[in-house]
A protein has these predicted regions:
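Interfacial aromatic-anchored transmembrane helix boundaries in multi-pass membrane proteins
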Residues: 20-33, 58-92
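Short helix-perturbing small/polar motifs within transmembrane alpha-helices
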Residues: 7, 11, 18, 75-122
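Alpha-helical membrane-inserting segments
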Residues: 15, 19, 23, 41, ...
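Membrane-interfacial segments
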Residues: 23, 27, 68, 72, ...
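Active-site-proximal inter-transmembrane loops
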Residues: 69-77, 136-152
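Alpha-helical transmembrane segments and their cytosolic interface
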Residues: 1-10, 144-180
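Hydrophobic transmembrane alpha-helices
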Residues: 1-51
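Hydrophobic alpha-helical transmembrane segments
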Residues: 6-10, 36, 40, 50-56, ...
Protein backbone atom coordinates (compact mmCIF):
# COMPACT_ATOMS: atom_id res chain seq x y z
CA UNK A 1 0.00 0.00 0.00
CA UNK A 2 1.38 3.39 -1.00
CA UNK A 3 1.80 6.27 1.43
CA UNK A 4 -0.86 8.22 -0.49
CA UNK A 5 -3.34 5.35 -0.05
CA UNK A 6 -2.58 5.04 3.67
CA UNK A 7 -3.05 8.78 4.09
CA UNK A 8 -6.36 8.84 2.20
CA UNK A 9 -7.70 5.85 4.15
CA UNK A 10 -6.70 7.50 7.44
CA UNK A 11 -8.32 10.78 6.39
CA UNK A 12 -11.53 9.00 5.43
CA UNK A 13 -11.62 7.08 8.74
CA UNK A 14 -11.16 10.41 10.55
CA UNK A 15 -13.93 11.97 8.44
CA UNK A 16 -16.24 9.09 9.33
CA UNK A 17 -15.44 9.43 13.04
CA UNK A 18 -16.07 13.19 12.94
CA UNK A 19 -19.30 12.84 10.97
CA UNK A 20 -20.49 10.27 13.51
CA UNK A 21 -20.46 12.94 16.20
CA UNK A 22 -22.60 15.35 14.21
CA UNK A 23 -25.88 13.77 15.18
CA UNK A 24 -29.46 14.17 16.25
CA UNK A 25 -29.96 11.56 18.98
CA UNK A 26 -33.27 9.93 18.10
CA UNK A 27 -34.14 6.33 18.94
CA UNK A 28 -33.43 3.62 18.06
CA UNK A 29 -30.82 4.95 15.61
CA UNK A 30 -29.46 8.53 15.66
CA UNK A 31 -29.45 10.73 12.59
CA UNK A 32 -25.80 11.42 11.77
CA UNK A 33 -23.58 12.53 8.93
CA UNK A 34 -21.97 9.06 8.84
CA UNK A 35 -23.65 8.25 5.56
CA UNK A 36 -22.23 11.43 4.02
CA UNK A 37 -18.78 10.19 5.02
CA UNK A 38 -19.49 6.71 3.64
CA UNK A 39 -20.53 8.25 0.33
CA UNK A 40 -17.32 10.29 0.22
CA UNK A 41 -15.27 7.18 1.02
CA UNK A 42 -16.92 5.26 -1.81
CA UNK A 43 -16.51 8.16 -4.21
CA UNK A 44 -12.86 8.92 -3.41
CA UNK A 45 -11.15 5.62 -2.61
CA UNK A 46 -10.47 2.42 -4.50
CA UNK A 47 -12.81 -0.49 -3.67
CA UNK A 48 -10.20 -2.17 -1.46
CA UNK A 49 -9.33 1.03 0.37
CA UNK A 50 -12.99 2.01 0.78
CA UNK A 51 -13.74 -1.38 2.36
CA UNK A 52 -10.63 -1.02 4.52
CA UNK A 53 -11.65 2.44 5.76
CA UNK A 54 -15.02 1.07 6.88
CA UNK A 55 -13.37 -1.92 8.56
CA UNK A 56 -10.81 0.23 10.40
CA UNK A 57 -13.55 2.54 11.64
CA UNK A 58 -15.57 -0.41 12.96
CA UNK A 59 -12.55 -2.02 14.65
CA UNK A 60 -11.51 1.28 16.26
CA UNK A 61 -14.97 1.60 17.76
CA UNK A 62 -15.16 -2.01 18.89
CA UNK A 63 -11.83 -1.79 20.73
CA UNK A 64 -13.18 1.13 22.70
CA UNK A 65 -12.22 4.32 20.90
CA UNK A 66 -15.20 6.71 21.05
CA UNK A 67 -15.66 7.01 17.29
CA UNK A 68 -19.30 5.89 17.06
CA UNK A 69 -22.22 8.34 17.39
CA UNK A 70 -22.42 10.07 20.75
CA UNK A 71 -18.70 9.45 21.34
CA UNK A 72 -19.46 5.81 22.05
CA UNK A 73 -17.41 2.73 21.40
CA UNK A 74 -16.56 -0.64 22.89
CA UNK A 75 -17.53 -4.23 22.24
CA UNK A 76 -21.01 -3.61 23.70
CA UNK A 77 -21.73 -1.56 20.57
CA UNK A 78 -22.20 -4.90 18.83
CA UNK A 79 -25.62 -5.23 20.49
CA UNK A 80 -26.75 -1.72 19.59
CA UNK A 81 -29.60 -1.42 17.07
CA UNK A 82 -27.38 0.97 15.09
CA UNK A 83 -24.44 -1.43 14.77
CA UNK A 84 -25.80 -3.08 11.62
CA UNK A 85 -25.41 0.25 9.87
CA UNK A 86 -21.79 0.43 11.04
CA UNK A 87 -21.20 -3.08 9.68
CA UNK A 88 -22.72 -2.00 6.37
CA UNK A 89 -20.24 0.84 5.86
CA UNK A 90 -17.51 -1.53 4.64
CA UNK A 91 -19.67 -3.20 2.01
CA UNK A 92 -21.46 0.00 0.99
CA UNK A 93 -18.29 2.02 0.42
CA UNK A 94 -16.51 -0.88 -1.24
CA UNK A 95 -19.37 -1.61 -3.64
CA UNK A 96 -19.88 2.05 -4.47
CA UNK A 97 -16.17 2.45 -5.22
CA UNK A 98 -16.21 -0.74 -7.29
CA UNK A 99 -19.12 0.52 -9.39
CA UNK A 100 -17.48 3.93 -9.88
CA UNK A 101 -14.15 2.58 -11.17
CA UNK A 102 -13.31 4.30 -14.44
CA UNK A 103 -16.54 6.32 -14.44
CA UNK A 104 -16.73 10.07 -14.03
CA UNK A 105 -20.19 11.22 -15.09
CA UNK A 106 -22.70 12.69 -12.68
CA UNK A 107 -25.11 9.84 -13.45
CA UNK A 108 -22.52 7.31 -12.26
CA UNK A 109 -21.92 9.16 -9.00
CA UNK A 110 -25.65 9.17 -8.34
CA UNK A 111 -25.95 5.45 -9.12
CA UNK A 112 -22.94 4.66 -6.92
CA UNK A 113 -24.47 6.74 -4.13
CA UNK A 114 -27.80 4.96 -4.44
CA UNK A 115 -25.99 1.61 -4.33
CA UNK A 116 -24.19 2.64 -1.15
CA UNK A 117 -27.37 3.91 0.45
CA UNK A 118 -29.28 0.74 -0.46
CA UNK A 119 -26.53 -1.51 0.93
CA UNK A 120 -26.51 0.48 4.17
CA UNK A 121 -30.23 -0.10 4.62
CA UNK A 122 -30.22 -3.71 3.41
CA UNK A 123 -27.73 -4.60 6.14
CA UNK A 124 -28.65 -2.06 8.82
CA UNK A 125 -32.41 -2.48 8.99
CA UNK A 126 -32.52 -6.29 9.41
CA UNK A 127 -29.77 -6.06 12.06
CA UNK A 128 -31.74 -3.36 13.87
CA UNK A 129 -34.86 -5.53 13.76
CA UNK A 130 -33.00 -8.55 15.12
CA UNK A 131 -31.55 -6.53 18.01
CA UNK A 132 -34.81 -4.77 18.84
CA UNK A 133 -37.10 -7.78 18.52
CA UNK A 134 -34.75 -10.61 19.42
CA UNK A 135 -32.39 -9.19 22.01
CA UNK A 136 -34.41 -6.32 23.45
CA UNK A 137 -37.70 -8.21 23.46
CA UNK A 138 -39.69 -5.72 21.40
CA UNK A 139 -42.35 -7.00 19.05
CA UNK A 140 -42.10 -4.52 16.22
CA UNK A 141 -43.71 -5.26 12.87
CA UNK A 142 -41.78 -4.92 9.63
CA UNK A 143 -43.60 -1.63 9.03
CA UNK A 144 -42.62 -0.31 12.47
CA UNK A 145 -39.00 -1.24 11.86
CA UNK A 146 -39.06 0.63 8.54
CA UNK A 147 -40.63 3.62 10.27
CA UNK A 148 -37.85 3.58 12.86
CA UNK A 149 -34.86 2.85 10.63
CA UNK A 150 -35.65 3.96 7.09
CA UNK A 151 -38.46 6.44 6.49
CA UNK A 152 -37.19 9.32 8.70
CA UNK A 153 -33.76 9.10 7.08
CA UNK A 154 -34.68 9.26 3.38
CA UNK A 155 -34.95 13.07 2.98
CA UNK A 156 -31.62 13.65 4.71
CA UNK A 157 -29.97 10.86 2.75
CA UNK A 158 -31.02 12.49 -0.51
CA UNK A 159 -29.53 15.81 0.62
CA UNK A 160 -26.32 14.06 1.73
CA UNK A 161 -26.13 12.25 -1.61
CA UNK A 162 -26.43 15.52 -3.52
CA UNK A 163 -23.78 17.18 -1.35
CA UNK A 164 -21.42 14.20 -1.62
CA UNK A 165 -21.74 14.13 -5.41
CA UNK A 166 -20.92 17.84 -5.70
CA UNK A 167 -17.94 17.52 -3.33
CA UNK A 168 -16.61 14.31 -4.86
CA UNK A 169 -16.83 15.62 -8.43
CA UNK A 170 -14.49 18.41 -7.34
CA UNK A 171 -12.18 16.38 -5.09
CA UNK A 172 -11.79 13.07 -6.90
CA UNK A 173 -9.73 14.34 -9.85
CA UNK A 174 -7.36 16.00 -7.37
CA UNK A 175 -7.03 13.09 -4.93
CA UNK A 176 -7.43 9.83 -6.74
CA UNK A 177 -5.79 8.33 -9.76
CA UNK A 178 -7.91 5.75 -11.55
CA UNK A 179 -5.06 3.25 -11.22
CA UNK A 180 -5.97 2.60 -7.55
Amino acid sequence: MKAKDITLVALMVALLAICSQLSIPIQPVPITLQTLAVLMIGFLLSPRNAFLAGAIYMVLGLIGLPVFAGFSGGYQSFISPAFGFIISFMAAAGLGAWYLQGKTGMKHYIIAGLIMTAVTYLIGIPYMGIILNGLNGASLSFYQILMAGLIPFIPGDLVKLALAVVLAKQLRPRLVSESN
